[in-house]
């Protein structure tokens, strides 16, 4: 004979089954087989057998284990409920969990809910009230929190919880919990998350809200001065209790803490809840002050997750600007103007960006002077003014104070000194100082090691620099590292930049069409953020890659589109290189005279920009045009440019130039 029973139910019902089983075992007449909880691997195996015909994703197995704690009955019933409701279905060769027809998802199967509610109904009123407060507190709780709902004194609640835990009913003991106010009480955890869910959902809405407030009050007193470090927990209870005024500062604190941990997606969730809560408060200066701080925090968070030029970033800073003006907040205005300047910069609106930054400096405050110089370095670099860019970057670094509070970093989430170093690096390459450029790029990375977003930026810029230097293998390595950092932390703009540079480098090192596809995909992702800043540059990389993999004709179409995008009304740092690439492609088609003209245009533009490295590269390629020997004038010009260099003699261009000059 085989029989089953639950020890906790037998104890609750007063049935003698436990004693009977012990006596039978003592006489050797029975064997007890305890069915333990399943681990994550066992749950995955159960799902694999119960869901044939498609793969079971690891995240689905983890979710089921988390919801059921591995209780076999719960696993089977939850799986059955989701499949019966059509919420779990195969798609593209794998099982996917989707919302049901009503837009929600069945958290507790009906049969299982009835079973759990029967167990709850066997409790006396005091135990049930105590467990309801505990359910409001969370999956883990202190007895002191459970006592806040009026279910008795701390000692009485602690004793009741301990009794339930001893009998294996609903709770497990976890050890003592000490709060900063001196309170020490026993800690407990719900045996199963489904128990807590059923308990929580059966509490009437009004009582549930009051319990959340009671729990928040007790936690706030218990945490005392340390309450700020528990801001997210307190905000959750206060929102659930509809106390939006008290929840607001905790949500702001939680968002600020998330940004400090480089968790911008988490910060956005808190800030969206905060902005919603503020709409429920009376209008007035106090509400506007809170919204201003929220929008100023939202700008950098959105920048990190959606890109510099996204409409959401512009909307956050635009609203913050309106509030700064209304509240007369000059300090905050400087931060907001910088954010708007960054948006303009990454949409290639250089004049607007420069005007906003000049306005910041004209305000005569030291606030964000470093950041303003950093963004001016970016703006002037993209306009082809490498010398001005380097000057702004170095003035910014002169303002950098290592001991200053850089909690917010730049208003778009990046360490300003890191940015100054890498703009100095990129400008220096164009100015003909490739080795010093590399030193600045490496300093940027060293400074960024403790801040993931700045680290992703510094690694991307190292990939840029090696691309400029013509070192495809090094560019590929740094692009790979940048992609790993950016993808791991959820920084899409840096991820797509790394993908573009990595695609170019892959095409140049292996002539693999996969590099071109990666480059195209990255470019599409870049444009999807709304950014236009480097669009012509990326098209130049695509043309260069196409020349290696598919031949010159398609590359010519792409590079001519890049030149058209730059137009005639604005300078652009990479325009000399675009004409040089066009010359290379024309030369490969055997059109030597047209190629020479393209090189001449590249040389003219580079000389006008004062960008010595770009001028030397164009002169070098002009000397190597197919079916055409370099003229003495071309060779003399290359010699003149080569002799101006004082460093970088190991870089590919200078090595090739030296070989060509010595060969002649």
Residue ranges with predicted function:
Residues 488, 495-496, 500-568, 575-576, ...:
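Alpha-helical scaffold segments of alpha-solenoid architecture
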Residues 9-10, 172, 198-399, 425-439, ...:
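Inter-helical turn/loop elements of alpha-helical hairpins
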Residues 226-230, 247-248, 370, 417-420, ...:
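Generic helix N-cap/helix-start motif at coil->alpha-helix transitions
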Residues 444-523:
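Acidic, glycine-rich loop-and-beta core segments that form the ion-binding/anion-interacting portion
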Residues 3, 35-269, 273-282, 546:
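Short secondary-structure boundary elements
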Residues 279-287, 401-416:
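Short, flexible, glycine-rich and Lys/Arg-enriched loop motifs at helix boundaries
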Residues 1-33:
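Sensor-1/coupling segment of RecA-like P-loop NTPase cores
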Residues 554-612:
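Generic long, charged, amphipathic alpha-helical segments
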């Amino acid at each position: 004979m085989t029989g089953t029973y639950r020890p906790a139910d037998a104890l609750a019902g007063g049935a003698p089954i436990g004693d009977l089983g012990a006596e039978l075992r003592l006489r050797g007449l029975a064997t007890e087989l305890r069915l333990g909880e399943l681990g994550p691997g066992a749950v995955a195996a159960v799902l694999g057998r119960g869901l044939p015909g498609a793969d079971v994703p690891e995240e689905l197995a983890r979710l089921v284990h988390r919801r059921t704690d591995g209780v076999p009955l719960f696993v089977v019933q939850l799986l059955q409920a989701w499949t019966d409701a059509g919420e779990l279905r195969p798609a593209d060769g794998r099982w996917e969990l989707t919302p049901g027809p009503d837009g929600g998802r069945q958290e507790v199967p009906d049969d299982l809910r009835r079973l759990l509610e029967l167990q709850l109904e066997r409790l006396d009123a005091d135990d049930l009230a105590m467990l309801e407060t505990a359910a409001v507190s969370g999956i883990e709780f202190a007895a002191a929190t459970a006592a806040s709902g009026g279910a008795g004194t701390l000692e009485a609640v602690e004793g009741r919880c301990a009794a339930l835990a001893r009998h294996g009913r609903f709770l497990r003991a976890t050890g003592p919990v000490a709060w900063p106010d001196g309170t020490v009480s026993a800690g407990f955890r719900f045996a199963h998350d489904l128990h807590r869910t059923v308990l929580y959902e059966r509490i009437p809405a009004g009582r549930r809200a009051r319990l959340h407030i009671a729990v928040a009050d007790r936690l706030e007193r218990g945490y005392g001065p340390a309450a700020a470090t528990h801001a997210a927990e307190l905000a959750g209870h206060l929102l659930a209790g509809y106390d939006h005024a008290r929840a607001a500062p905790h949500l702001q604190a939680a968002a600020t803490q998330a940004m400090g941990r480089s968790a911008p997606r988490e910060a956005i969730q808190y800030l969206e809840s905060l902005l919603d809560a503020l709409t429920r408060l009376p209008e007035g200066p106090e509400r506007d002050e809170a919204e201003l701080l929220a929008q100023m925090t939202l700008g950098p968070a959105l920048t990190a997750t959606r890109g510099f030029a996204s409409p959401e970033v512009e909307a956050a800073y635009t609203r913050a600007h309106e509030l700064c003006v209304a509240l007369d907040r000059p300090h905050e205005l400087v931060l907001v103007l910088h954010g708007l300047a960054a948006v303009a910069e990454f949409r290639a609106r250089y004049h607007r960006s420069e005007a906003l930054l000049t306005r910041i400096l004209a305000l005569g405050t030291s606030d964000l002077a470093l950041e303003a110089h950093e963004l001016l370095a970016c703006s002037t670099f993209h306009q082809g003014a490498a010398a001005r860019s380097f000057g702004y970057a170095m003035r910014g670094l002169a303002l950098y104070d290592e001991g200053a509070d850089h909690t917010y970093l730049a208003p778009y989430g990046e360490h300003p000194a890191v940015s100054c170093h890498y703009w100095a690096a990129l400008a220096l390459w164009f100015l003909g100082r490739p080795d010093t450029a590399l030193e600045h790029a490496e300093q940027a990375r060293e400074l960024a090691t403790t801040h993931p977003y700045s680290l992703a930026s510094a690694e991307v810029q190292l990939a840029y620099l090696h691309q400029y230097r013509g070192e495809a293998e090094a560019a590929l390595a740094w692009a790979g590292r940048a992609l790993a950092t950016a993808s791991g932390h959820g920084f899409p703009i840096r991820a797509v930049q790394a993908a573009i540079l990595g695609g170019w480098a892959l095409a140049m090192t292996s002539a693999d069409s996969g590099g071109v596809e990666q480059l195209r995909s990255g470019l599409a992702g870049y444009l999807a953020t709304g950014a236009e800043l480097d669009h012509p540059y990326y098209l130049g990389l695509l043309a260069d890659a196409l020349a290696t993999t598919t031949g010159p004709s398609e590359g010519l179409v792409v590079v001519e589109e890049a030149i058209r995008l730059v137009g005639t009304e604005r300078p652009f740092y990479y325009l000399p290189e675009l004409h040089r690439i066009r010359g290379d492609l024309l030369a490969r088609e055997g059109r030597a005279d047209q190629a020479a003209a393209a090189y001449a245009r590249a040389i003219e533009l580079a000389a006008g920009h004062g960008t010595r490295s770009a001028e030397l590269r164009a002169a070098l390629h002009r000397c190597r045009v197919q079916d055409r020997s370099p003229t003495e004038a071309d060779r003399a010009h290359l010699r003149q440019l080569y002799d101006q260099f004082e460093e970088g003699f190991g870089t590919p261009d200078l090595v090739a130039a030296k070989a060509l000059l010595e060969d002649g």
